[in-house]
Amino acid sequence: MNILSSVGSFGFLTLISRVLGYFRDILIAIFLGTSFLADAFFVAFRLPNTFRRLFAEGSFNSAFVPQYSKLDIKKKAFEFANSVFNLLIFFLFVLVCVAEVFMGGVIYIISPGFIENPEKYNLAVTLSRIAFPFLLFVSLSSFYSAILNTKGRFAVAAAAPIILNLLLIASIFYAKFFDKELVYFMAWAVTLAGILQLIMLAIYAKKYFTPKISFNFKISSEVKHFFKRLLPSIFSSGVMQINILVGTVIASFQTSAVSYLYYADRIYQLPLAITGIAIGTVILPSLSKEIFQNKDGKNFFLQNRSIELSLFLSAPATVGIIMATEPIISTLFGYGSFDQESIRQTSKALFVFGFGLPAFSLLKIYSSFYFARGNTKFPFYVSVLTVIINILISIILFNRLGFVSIALGTTISCWCAILIYQFFLLTNGMHKFDKTFIARVSKIFVCSFIMSAVLSFLLFKFQFAFEHGSIHKIFSLTVIVGISALIYFLLSILFKSFSIKDFKVKNYDTK
């Protein structure tokens, strides 16, 4: 398998989804801004969407792929997958039914501050009831994605979330054109998108797996092992999403804070699509195979190149976000109901999140190093510690910094997790930095530093352009980003801080 090609296709399609997600969010910003309607919808959307990210971008793959990859007998692999599929249907259906009945309590738990505004609280409950069945469909979609990933078919799984964003965009236009209640149509679009994603992935995975629905459960040792690993995987793979959910709980006590954090989150998620999620997802099947075959040399090579690639992509994105925070928010969201105060407050959160971008990217990759070895316990413990650190920082500093403390807690806690992961990888002989890694990472930092000087000059030259209309802002930001990125990549070629040929490795036969 060509790792770079797989990362490229997965990352590109994920990036397309994120760009469509941005377009969706700019429409929401124009029509809803940071109003109580926006807060209510974001809470309702965040609940099932958090589960989507938990399953689709980490935990299910982490528990399923290594286990499924080891079963080289076709019949045994089918029995394992079929049992998992049927159990998922049963448990998820029960979970959705229970949540629908007790949704009022669920919203009180995740957004306790909403109770002070009955209209906002009741709207959030109603919208959540409409959108929550998405969880059932997206979780089953993740099952099919995992099947496809074990066969080296990453593109379809990456393309599936595009459906969600297209339907949400369509629902916004439909509601505005026919003068309907916007937030209700958006909530229904979420559930419909889940159904369509599931149908699409089931069709593409049919070649490799067609389930036999049966509730006469046969729980083999492999199935027990899978579910034993799944819960720790959910927590450890989804630590970023859990941190965001924790942030939503705390932010609900400050007016519009949920919206500020949501919009800031959407910006750094764009580069994160490639710098962490794509690399971590693609590297897991390869690494699982090599570890199963006891090829330590190749393990270390794959791990070093994965970290390199993540830093190569996240370093310039980090510099750009930190230095151009307000121009980015103003250009991407500063229209309609999204006023100057919204721009200023959202920029504060994005600035702090920017310092955490490399850690957010590496988190997915480092946890994959453990998951590939069948170790879900250690990432689970690290994730628990990470969430505790995040909660403590967010609560302690909330009175002084407001919602910014939530961004700070997320950033610091994720960097702590990276340091812990790396320390134990080195001390347990599961990783060794090679000379190539040290040389290239040093060059990446040099290239990023030079790019920051160029970016600073460009921001100074274009500073007044962001005070004008949308055309001026979009043109100026495009020029600034384009020139800065070009300088960075030219410097990278000059200093040889990245090598494409290292990723053209045939790791295993995916057919």
Label every PLM stretch briefly.
Residues 1-511:
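Membrane-embedded alpha-helical bundles of multi-pass transporters/translocases
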